[in-house]
């Protein structure tokens, strides 16, 4: 499939959103239009913790299965989510749900990423990014508190999680090469092939 059109018409966004819909719903440019809207509503309201966690476990599992089917020597495949993700989010729910949530998180035992990058940040950076994404169901102050809680769990769990590195993303932008190069170096990722750009004389 190819998406074409003039500059600024929305090609990149459409490619990302459609690719997301056709690839288990985890990489879209904002989740609106991709996820069932009840997922975000329930996250914001703190409802249905086991259902929310099971949904993400199913999304992650589908992507790990897809990655396994498409893996090959020299190939680098990125997935969002790992067992540590499901475990870190347990902290945001009342203790009476924790046993059921741990049972859901155990699904992540089958996932074996070569590297897990835990992104962490200051609350100022997080507030800026939450404001920028402007989700209809998000209260910014509540989301910042939620981030602090979950971020602390990621930091606590990371030392015991295999092949896991914690990277503070403050000051890093992922829309420019410097930020990406920093992540690649810090995580010890393999080199990537770059298509060269050349100035060429007209004929």
Regions from the language model: what does each represent?
Residues 6:
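P-loop (Walker A) phosphate-binding loop of NTP-binding proteins
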Residues 14, 18:
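Hydrophobic positions on the alpha1 helix immediately C-terminal to the Walker A/P-loop
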Residues 11:
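Conserved lysine of the Walker
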Residues 52-60, 96-101, 142-150:
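Soluble or luminal CAZymes and related metallo-dependent hydrolases
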Residues 3:
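Hydrophobic anchor at the beta1->P-loop junction of P-loop NTPases
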Residues 128-137, 142-203:
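NTP-dependent small-molecule kinase module
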Residues 20-65:
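Conserved substrate/cofactor phosphate-moiety recognition/catalytic segment
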Residues 68-72, 77-136:
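ATP-dependent NMP and nucleoside kinases share a basic, alpha-helical "lid"
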